[in-house]
Amino acid sequence: MTGIVTDPDVLRDLRIRSANLIDEIEEVLFRNQLSRPLSANLTNNMAVIQGLTHQAADLQFTKFACRGGLQGAILFAIDFVNYELMVAGIVEPLTGLNWTQAEVGRPLLEQVAKTIAPVGGAEAVDNVKGALDSIWSGGAVVFLDGTSGAVSINVGKINKRSITRPVSEQVVMGPHAGFIEDGMTNLSLVRQRLKTPRLWIDRMQVGRHTRTAVYLLSLYGVTDGALVDEVKSRLCQINIDGVLDSNYLVELVKSDRWTIFPTVLRTERPDRVAAGLLEGRVAIIVDGSPLAIVAPATLPMMMTSAADYYQNWMVATFLRIVRYIALTASLLTPGLYVALTTYHQEAIPTPLLITMAAARSDVPLPAVGEVLLLMVLFDIIREAGARVPTGIGSALTIGGTLVVGQAAVRAGIISSPIIIVVAGIVIAVLAIPNPELVQAVRFATYPVILGGAILGVYGILFVTIGLALHLASLESFGVAYLSPAAPIRPTDFKDFIIRLPWFRQTTRPAQTGYTDVMRQGPRSS
Amino acid sequence: MTARGLERWGALLLLPIFLTGCWDNFQMNQLAIVDALAVDYNRGQYHVVAEVFNTMAVPAPAQSSPTATGGSNHSSSVFLEGAGKTLGEALADVSASSSRHVFWASTQVLLLGTGALQQGLGPLFGTFLHYPQFRSTARVLAVPGSAQSALESDTSGMEITVAQEIRNQDRYLHHDLSQGWAPRLYDVMRWDTEHGRSMVLLSLEKKPESKMNPQFRMDQSLVIGPDGRARGSLPSHDAMAYLWITGRFSQGYVAAGCPAGAGQTTIYLTSVSARSHVVVQRGTVRGIHIRLTGTGKVAGPLCANLSGLNMAANRRMVSLTMQTVDWAEAHDADIFGWGQQIYRQTPELWNDMPGYWRSRFPHMPVSVTSHVTIVQGDEGRV
């Protein structure tokens, strides 16, 4: 039975299905082309590769001829290879050979691989995919006319910057080296600190298109094998087209995905990675990212600076207490200001109340409006300051200060006490050592303000309880986010708010270092 | 915790939401911040005057510049008035008289006129107790006559409020003295009337035609009986002994007669303390014995040897103390808290004699001994 379909819904469905079918057919054809074996015909190989890559501008075929007349070509990616090395190490030896067109076959490629390959090594390539994969890794692929297959010779050049100070985790005393975008360099920085065969490094490749190298580091005998397996399994499950930074992996592998609080530690410091490994954690280094991942991580870890371990333990303890005060202040102060000035004026000393009331006498906005306006304004200035070039940054600071600090008060848009409050928390929040926690606290401040505006201190209490419950519910690879505070673990208080001296820190953290508990032998303590 | 328990806790947490919320918030510039309150009673009505800070007179940071004078065109305070048959009605009337929300919590000074005191403290403080936002740290002062006249000042353009002026007097001139004289509201609320205690309120007076703000007056201090009504004014010469006995002040000057009729000299008491001993025999309070101890020095002419001056000074202190006790007994006002002392020492005895103390106190035998050591002061060396 035949007929003409007229129903628009059915037609639309058919159109979508046919479009999907075409896409699938194209994908299959593309894959077939990729896995196609390299033929003996040089021109044909060149045509296939150029067709597949749409004649990519950064790919170059250079033809050559041996002294004996054999034709060949070298395929490489511009700026991925050391050009001088390629010419001197591959092109010149090949053109000097007496091979003729009649001498075709596999042995020629093997000879190339064995005799003229530079130090970087060589490997045989059988199909188009193999050829393309190798050129993105710095290989020069040699084709010989009449010989099926090719040989890839590593003459790679790595574009990388030199090792510099970490941007977000600087210390006055202590090591100043920071990670860069090159994964191997980052591995070497960790290896310099852990010169032990127990440092195990697993290499994986993540990202269908980016094919990013990911290194999983663990300390054999110290890190729990189950933790390593878990992280490895989560990494293996990733099926994404590209990984451009370690944060891609963080969002894909971390335990609690719907939270603003960082549940893994991202650090630019190789010493923090080494310290994490010594505590029984794992680290992930992603090629192309200057930030390594340390997991599992807890909130107290985020409140810890690397400098804590490079200075007197009492000073470090004091600074940690100051940081916790700054954390609490930056989280609660704007909300408390709104609650006190709107609901609980009796809690304000009378002289201050009069001054504040006088300062607010001409302000049209309610206190919550003032606070939100100024908070958003400060966030805009801060965000803009993070983007603009250094030269314009000072102008921005002056502009922001003048506009917010002077003009807004004089114009009666905001009152002066609120500037003190917001400026205070802007400074206080910077005392938190972890930039991701800083962002989370900035975000969490807004619900506290709204809670204070709606229900006063009671509202703040509500939001704070909610926040505490949320934090207590988080975990990082099986470790409670608030540990050792919740669940309470007194043995780990040695490195919580108080940092005990090293001679008292004889054991690893119980939450991660249970495989090899003792950190120091009896003599050192 | 069971699910039912969780539900109960959840309900308890949620319930207070209905007690407060964004519907009852006030921005600070909507507040009429009360600094002082004067309460009078006449013609069957309570009259209340609230002195409110004029925030317009406070220089805002936006106006501050080297040329600005800080709101000198404005008076530092404005007055809100209200009247009603009860104090609550009068306070509500004050609230209604302002377009702003009257904010009682900052009240620092509470002036009570004679008329209001004659009505008794019970209705006054009962009302304040029902105003939860009323701060109980306010100083309570008595005003002979009208409290309103003491509070209202016609010195417009003053940079401080009348209440601030009163507090400054308290702070700089009478701080130590007023500890025992001008109790805070919470002291008054905790006042132990049950055990027969009377209270002394420092008085404040504004001279009728003076431009000056009201001043403290010791000689007009009002004694409030256990029933909360005024019993009379404590004479100024009795004030010192009252302070010694209650342990609120340990210094003072007394005039001592020189032996052999050689005139008088002045003794400066540097440290005096008193200890009251309640004599109980066979289940009855037989009397009170007061023992004065301490030191003093001759501040006037050294008109006799120290031994003689010692005796004269101690005699004078005994007579001063007895005079004060006599005044208190005559006015049936246990300002020394002896009833309270009996209750604390022997509660079972107190419980066995309901109403006994009220009738016994006016006739209670009291003895005084003084052992104050007088030394030669700088003046006496001349």
Regions found by a protein language model. Give the residues of each.
Chain B
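Membrane-proximal alpha-helical signals and transmembrane carboxylates
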Residues: 2-10, 16-382
